């Protein structure tokens, strides 16, 4: 058998440095974010005068440049001032006071602290000692800070504020990044008053601004003339429709270039962008489904198979009956009808189902659901979970409903 990779080994029509379009790449220029950069630099510049800067809360929707701009500015600060250390904390991963203290302590010392096992007061003392010993200013970036607060209220912020205020020789400031403008409304007033924060808002990009951003990246990724202007315009328009999401527009362009390279095409046109969008949306759908809790997956699977049986309207009671059958078939204990109703509402909030409440007069209100995306695609992604892989829809009985 010929080597199946041989056809990719020859000279490619398009040569591209796609790493410059990856999500973790931090560019050296930020079109249309000059004001936000200047605001952040002004606040952090107090370090250059030997003073601890105010805490900063960065607000903005997904894809508005919050994280990359913050990383860029703090990188420039470290280059300008040798007595600064920056600790980046992804709150999707580090979501407790303990884990955040571990991240800070490990950045300030050579010996790693275990991520579990120490009492919180011990890890706090160790963090204070290590930070003091360095003699540096510490900037703690809390990316997706809203996740942290939603999970444990203001506990993590309280620990950080304690670190900032209890020991004079510990010079720690925080930059919180969030897409939730109400994030601080749910924390204790005493914590909020001690936060002493300044806010920087990243507004959504418009299509023209996203076009500038894509063009500035492409200048370093590809040779001239490889991407049609119409393709850039389309990419920018799609990003602008998604609340000014430059990240999505850049991802679409990266996928479009990958498609062109694999297919040995010599240009990126609108066709490649449309192909990229379809692939992108399928990837997003697959990821959204893969991260659902087990019983949410079973409920979604039940909604899909119930809709296959009764395409016109799928009501909560029918979904629950099929959910219970699927649980019995796969050996899981079913949750209560009330809990399943809550999970159905959550799936609608995630955009995986459409919910319709109807007033049926003397029969009361009824709630029905329908699947947003292609049912077969959703089922395929659900059955990728090994817990559900043995499901056979042929076992589901045909239900009889008498509509009123």
From Swiss-Prot:
Disulfide bonds: none annotated. Pfam families: AAA_22 (PF13401), Cdc6_C (PF09079), Cdc6_lid (PF22703). ATP binds at residues 64-68, 205, 217. Changing residue 66 to E: Does not affect stimulation of helicase activity. One of its GO terms (biological process) is DNA replication. GO terms for molecular function: ATP binding; ATP hydrolysis activity. Keywords: ATP-binding, DNA replication, Nucleotide-binding. InterPro entries: AAA+_ATPase, AAA_22, Cdc6_C, Cdc6_lid, ORC1/CDC6, Orc1/Cdc6_arc, P-loop_NTPase, WH-like_DNA-bd_sf. The N-terminal AAA+ ATPase domain and the C-terminal winged-helix (WH) domain are both required for stimulation of MCM activity. NCBIfam families: orc1/cdc6 family replication initiation protein, PRK00411.1-3. Interacts with MCM. Belongs to the CDC6/cdc18 family. Involved in regulation of DNA replication. Stimulates the helicase activity of MCM via stimulation of its ATPase activity. Binding to MCM may result in conformational changes in MCM, leading to catalytic ATP hydrolysis by the helicase. Directly stimulates MCM movement along single-stranded and double-stranded DNA. Does not bind DNA. This is ORC1-type DNA replication protein 2. It comes from Thermoplasma acidophilum (strain ATCC 25905 / DSM 1728 / JCM 9062 / NBRC 15155 / AMRC-C165).
